[in-house]
């Protein structure tokens, strides 16, 4: 679930070239600038740098609309992929030094979306991730993976609340099935492992030690997406 790709960074290696060209003109205030490779910027300048509100269009169709500071995307802004993409994906939110940083929303081409915290271009902190198939996770993330406390809801009605590590069920948690079954206990890498209690839908229960037990009554309680 990492979202920071090279092109998403608006590679102002390219921008370094762009900035040199702009600075030669020493543009100031509102204006526009066309680059030799077909890129185009329209907005505010300060001492020869993109600074303030502006719109930057790349030759491939990508577009950024928002705030700039000293030639870099900084503040609030929206970035969309190129027109050649089968479906558009975009990021809307806060930026720092050309990276997603702070609060934001990222929507993928397949309709999956994440809303929450970003850090230096990665999903990091707290947020909600919704998959295109209807699954949803709300909770803590680290380096783009489910990590910490969170809740995962499957489209089939199953749900888990508890601890995650490296994208999987790890630690103490509660898993519930639509049929009324429930497990409260320890998990290791997505499977029941350690001390716990399992209730059948008829109310009968088992308490004790579970050893690499995956699923109950044909159901799987493993998170398949990181």
Identify the function of each model-found stretch.
Residues 1-24:
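Eukaryotic acidic, serine/proline-rich intrinsically disordered low-complexity regions
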Residues 9, 32, 201, 211-214:
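Intrinsically disordered low-complexity regions specifically enriched for long asparagine
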Residues 13-15, 37, 60, 83, ...:
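Acidic/polar residues in short coil/turn loops that connect beta-strands
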Residues 16-28, 40-51, 63-74, 89-102, ...:
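Conserved anchor residues at repeat-unit boundaries in beta-strand-based tandem repeats, strongest
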Residues 30-32, 36:
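Alpha-helical segment of the N-proximal tetratricopeptide repeat
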Residues 215-226:
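Terminal, low-structured helical/coil segments at or just beyond the last alpha-helical repeat
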